[in-house]
Amino acid sequence: MVEIDNVKTRPVVQIKTTIFDDEAPSYLPAGKKWKLVWHDEFNGKEIDKTKWMCRESFWGQDFPAFAHNFEGVEMTGKTVRLHLLRKGNDFCSPHLQTGSLTYDIPKDTKGFWPFGKMRKPLFMHKYGYYEIRCKQPKYAGWHSAFWLQAPGVGSNPDASVCGVETDIMENYRQHNHGKIIAGNGWGGYGKDSKWFGHFSWDYEADKDGWCYYGVDWSPKGYTFYANGKKIGEQNSPVSNVEQFVLVSTEARGYRKIGNDGGLSAGRRTWGKPDPKLFEAVLPDFFEVDFVRVYDEVPQDVKLTKERIKFPKKFK
């Protein structure tokens, strides 16, 4: 992992922007005009299944760390909570996404083709600003993430035409080192995968525990932000294809050798839960206030203000 001291050398370059009445503001990159194109404020009584699906499989096999059928998803009327669940001596948690790719599809044939039937994506998008407001879990042994993937990532030697994994936020190192991680990976998840360039910064939250994370993805590259501050860039390669959004959690240990490109899954064996999971006091959860996606619009375009009505927050 590459440590980059961006906080000291880069100014605060985001502007606090009120988007909706009675909702938390966004922090948008300065110097550009933005238009909201997709969002979930998580105000309903149930998760919006027109926007989110669950990842339940890993490399064609049922993965014990992924909860099924939105189990562990709690709607508070203001936020969504993704809970860590204990089942005997095993643990799992929800993994939400707006699309799908080959390795999270159960294999449904005994023939040579290693993939099952593709799932229709619920939301795919190219370029723009992707933002989350969230509270991190209290206990170690599992992690949260906000990221982007493409259905064809790694399927072509040229990442620009098949997609890049963009990790906008991962809290792998929060509890042990006080760090949050971001950066890109490409080339798939096997021997061609490339992961250099990830960077970390000090974990910070407001007095109530809320954090903002985002990425400005453009044809020129990726600029990462946390809590109104620009914290890093990664400018090559750049995906020029539509990708889907993930808000995920995962109990550690089941991948055996960490992020090994799925090779342990290829052997159809899983590891055992991280011992730290047994120290967690439940309930523990990753809480999300909103996910928003914005498009950059040309400076000479005049935006019309549309008042969007939402159901009142539940008390």
Task: Spell out what each predicted region is.
Residues 2-315:
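GH16 jelly-roll
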